[in-house]
């Protein structure tokens, strides 16, 4: 089980990403737009840099929703590999079966 502080930190990052998503997208569009003047693009870059670091989605880490484990997490289920295995063997995930060929 991951430390509770690490799990809470990730939740805080997720909130910040959601809060600044529109603003970040607008600024990134201005920076990428070649038709804008150099000065406008520079100002947009400065505003983008002024946003909180944790508002950047690349700083988020996918964690298991049960244990908080940061590695070996399946995006589709939001679970770590070992918890996914336990739950799948109990038959609690509909349509998920062990591979057999």
UniProtKB/Swiss-Prot annotation:
> What Gene Ontology terms describe where this protein resides (cellular component)?
cytoplasm; small ribosomal subunit
Q: Which GO terms describe its biological process?
A: translation
Q: Which UniProt keywords apply?
A: Ribonucleoprotein, Ribosomal protein, RNA-binding, rRNA-binding
Q: Which GO terms describe its molecular function?
A: rRNA binding; structural constituent of ribosome
Disulfide-linked positions:
none
Specify the domain of life of the species encoding this protein: Bacteria
Q: What's the family?
A: Belongs to the universal ribosomal protein uS14 family.
**NCBIfam families recorded:** PRK08881.1 (NF006477)
HAMAP family cross-referenced by the UniProt entry: Ribosomal_uS14_1 (MF_00537)
- The identity of this protein, by name, is Small ribosomal subunit protein uS14
Tell me the organism: Ralstonia pickettii (strain 12J)
Q: Which gene encodes it?
A: rpsN
């Amino acid at each position: 089980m991951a430390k509770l502080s690490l799990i809470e930190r990730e939740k805080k990052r997720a909130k910040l990403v959601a809060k600044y998503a529109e603003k970040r997208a607008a600024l990134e569009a201005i920076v990428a737009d070649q038709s804008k003047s150099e000065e406008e693009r520079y100002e947009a870059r400065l505003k983008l840099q002024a946003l909180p670091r944790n508002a950047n989605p690349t700083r988020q880490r996918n964690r298991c929703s049960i244990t908080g484990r940061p590695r070996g997490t399946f995006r589709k289920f939001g679970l770590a590999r070992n918890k996914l295995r336990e739950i799948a063997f109990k038959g609690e995930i509909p349509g998920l079966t062990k591979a057999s060929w």
